[in-house]
From Swiss-Prot:
Source organism (scientific name): Aeromonas hydrophila subsp. hydrophila (strain ATCC 7966 / DSM 30187 / BCRC 13018 / CCUG 14551 / JCM 1027 / KCTC 2358 / NCIMB 9240 / NCTC 8049)
Keywords: Lyase
Gene3D superfamilies: Transcriptional coactivator/pterin dehydratase
Organism lineage string: Bacteria, Pseudomonadati, Pseudomonadota, Gammaproteobacteria, Aeromonadales
SUPFAM superfamilies hit by this protein: PCD-like
Catalytic activity: (4aS,6R)-4a-hydroxy-L-erythro-5,6,7,8-tetrahydrobiopterin = (6R)-L-erythro-6,7-dihydrobiopterin + H2O
InterPro entries: PCD_sf, Pterin-4-alpha-carb_dehyd, Pterin_deHydtase
Record-given protein name: Putative pterin-4-alpha-carbinolamine dehydratase
GO MF: 4-alpha-hydroxytetrahydrobiopterin dehydratase activity
Origin: domain of life: Bacteria
Enzyme class: lyase
Stated family: Belongs to the pterin-4-alpha-carbinolamine dehydratase family.
EC number(s) stated in the UniProt entry for this protein: 4.2.1.96
Coiled coil (residue ranges): none
């Protein structure tokens, strides 16, 4: 398990700080397959995972759903034939919190 994936998520409040530009740059180095992007004015992390068929994509989606429920932090998930697109951000703060990077790293671990 990566160092980032092994970290604990913290309960997030509406007044929690978003990651700074410096933190963003540091954390992105730990999850190089993810892309930061702005959607409807909110910074998010996005990654597309590819699979051989829909069954594998759906199985990954279900594992990710279990992970999200365990942490009570939920991504946007688009499951299609042969691919799953995952977006992490913290709805309460309208952007990225350290938890999103931890969950992105844990999402990567689901492939191992």
């Amino acid at each position: 398990m990566s160092e980032l994936a092994s970290q604990q998520c913290e309960a997030c409040r509406a007044d929690a700080p978003k990651v700074s530009e410096q933190e963003l740059n540091e954390l992105m180095r730990l999850i190089p397959d993810w892309q930061p992007l702005v959607v409807k004015g909110e910074l998010q992390l996005r990654r597309e995972f590819t699979f051989r068929n829909f069954k594998e994509a759906l199985a990954f989606t279900n594992r990710l759903g279990e992970l999200a429920e365990a942490e009570f932090h939920h991504p946007a998930i688009l499951t299609e034939w042969g691919k799953v697109t995952v977006s992490w951000w913290t709805h309460k703060i309208g952007g990225l919190h350290r938890n999103d990077f931890i969950m992105a790293a844990r999402t990567d671990e689901l492939l191992k």
